[in-house]
Amino acid sequence: INYSIASKYLFTGSVRYDGSSRFSKKNRWGFFPSGAFAWNVKQEDWLKDTKVVSQLKLRLSAGQTGQQDGIANYSYMPIYYLSTNSYDRYNMGSAGLQYYYTPGSYDPDITWETTTTYNVGVDFGFCDDRITGNVDAYVRNTSDLLNEVITPMGANFGNKILTNIGSMQNKGVEFSLNVVPVQTKDWHLSIGFNGTFQDTKITKLNTSDDPRYKEMVVDISKGTGSKFSFHKVGYAPYTYYPYQQ
């Protein structure tokens, strides 16, 4: 939905209602709203006739999104596995009987990861747009982050369970600046600059502050051993443990 008042005050709103069969019926649907407001300052009477400022707009926005990446199908259901090799069979004489064994780890309440983003920005232009640019600052908080936690021994054949237990924060500033120093009938020279400053850190990985839980180790496909990076509170995701040269 878009609504404008005198081309000065601009309102935008949207709603997503997403569903996924990867979740149980009670968590299958996610409601994700978003809204934005922009003030076209250039259209105000006290700035409209100013030639130095060719455009000036202030922006505010907030919204939520949901994602299901990293979740396998039927993760919320108990799945029984059929034994396949000689080590997973009952020996009855010369025959080995197959059997179904305890379901793997599962969480019936697994749900959407939800990311809430807040943004404030400004668009500007000077000297008939010979100088233009924008600056944006944002904070992005992700809750119900998926993480594998240790399960009690003997609960099943797996020692970890995937569940919504973490949170992460991402914040930063982005800017761009474009300058047109030469603009004639035959020549046009434009120079652009842009940059980003970003800080990302994990803020939670467990239900409690357990000093025994140091970090979540991440598997890799190759390398010495199979562990090289980890997720840890206070650090960016996929922080690495390389050897110092």
Model-flagged regions — what are they?
Residues 1-232:
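Extracellular/periplasmic, surface-exposed regions of secreted and cell-surface proteins
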Residues 239-245:
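Short, intrinsically disordered, charge-balanced linker/junction segments flanking boundaries
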Residues 236:
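Glycine-rich, Lys/Arg-enriched anion-binding loops that position phosphate/diphosphate groups
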